[in-house]
Amino acid sequence: MSALGLLAMISLARPAISEEIRIGYQKSSTLTAILKTNGELEKALAPLGITVSWHEFTSGLPLLEAINVGSVDFGADVADTVPIFAQAAGAKLAYVAEEAASPSAQAILVPKDSPVKSVADLKGKKVAVTKGAGSHFLLLAALAKSGLTFKDITPAYLTPADGRAAFVSNNVDAWVAWDPFLTSASRQSGARTLSDGSNGLASYKRYYVASAAFADRRGDALNVIFNKLAETGKWVKANPKDAATILAGLWGIDAAAVEEANSHRSYNVGAVTVPGLSEQQRIADAFVAEGLIPKKVNTTDVKIWAPKGS
């Protein structure tokens, strides 16, 4: 065999240089949690020479801050508001995928025996909310619909866990939560819903986001991730009890509550388009109007990654 032929054989036998993709997720990142548990994403990425490390965050905003500073490459689903806050802070992001609207998967809760009967009754009340979360916009939208502004309440910016603790101990008058926290609290405490996002109030899409640099460099990996997320979303809807059993152990919530929470989510993963970002602009403008974002944000002025064949 010639030296050239031997060199070719050695080159073909040499394994691809391994690269790690750092994936951030939060408790409500259902599809990512399932993929982390079953190992299917690692298997699918292995032929590309890619390994995966997983990093959990309390909510979406810290996750995207980690992407912005280069600590994470890809962020599992975050609420629609989160990329807007990150964009306002100058983050270089790329939309990778979206989950179709799930308006009933977030809501404003009050204790079952609360004298608060409507959103209008929240005037002067203390409300727990996670800053920059989708529920933050739901609160703004619900207040506006009732003739109130954000300045008419006293916000308590808390993580989901701290928000729930404050809620059950009656340290706040209301709590704006999303699933699975929402359903779990409602079932355990009998909390009442003042408003969810239905009837056009807040669509509550969820987005998968990568750093713009990673999207430019590893579109092949994003294609694999996109396809696996779409497959897993379909599986969850087709197998609600099996999905609930897996997630119950991960979330520390009983399977019946998980199944109910999952029924509120679409888990319909698709490509992000400019027309599909129309509500993002409405959300951004609402936060600017309340002085919660310092300057106008053009929500289409961001990279949109497109899956192969879209």
Which residues does each PLM region occupy?
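Sec/Tat signal peptide C-region and signal peptidase I cleavage site
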Residues: 12-18
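Small-molecule pocket liners
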Residues: 32, 102-108, 191-192, 204-213, ...
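Conserved C-terminal helix/tail region of periplasmic/extracytoplasmic solute-binding proteins
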Residues: 285-310
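Pocket-lining segment of extracytoplasmic ligand-binding domains
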Residues: 81, 155-156, 160-249
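Short, glycine-/small- and polar/acidic-enriched structural segments
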Residues: 19-149, 155-157, 173-179, 202
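Short, solvent-exposed loop/beta-turn-alpha elements that line the ligand-binding surface or hinge
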Residues: 42-50, 199, 268-276
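Secondary-structure end/capping motifs
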Residues: 216-292
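Bacterial N-terminal signal peptides
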Residues: 2-11
